[in-house]
């Protein structure tokens, strides 16, 4: 009977540790979800700003005529 009580106590202790671990992991998932939402919003804003950028009137270096050599 004592052995059965010890086994039950061990199981209760494991359950308590598992509950603590699950709560800790849940908090981490919540933080990561908030971070992901923030990053998605920043990406959306950057994409919007990038689509509004006008093309430059300056020719690329490959299109420029080389300077005269003396």
Curated annotation (Swiss-Prot):
Coiled coil: none
Domain of life: Bacteria
Cysteine disulfide partners in this protein: none
Gene3D superfamilies cross-referenced by the UniProt entry: 1.20.5.300
Similarity annotation: Belongs to the SlyX family.
Name of the protein described by the UniProt record: Protein SlyX homolog
């Amino acid at each position: 009977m004592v052995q059965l009580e010890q086994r039950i106590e061990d199981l209760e202790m494991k359950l308590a540790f598992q509950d603590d671990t699950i709560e800790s992991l849940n908090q981490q998932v919540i933080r990561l979800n908030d971070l992901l939402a923030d990053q998605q919003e920043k990406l959306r804003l950057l994409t919007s700003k990038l689509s509004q950028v006008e093309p430059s009137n300056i020719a690329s270096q490959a299109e420029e005529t080389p300077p005269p050599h003396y």
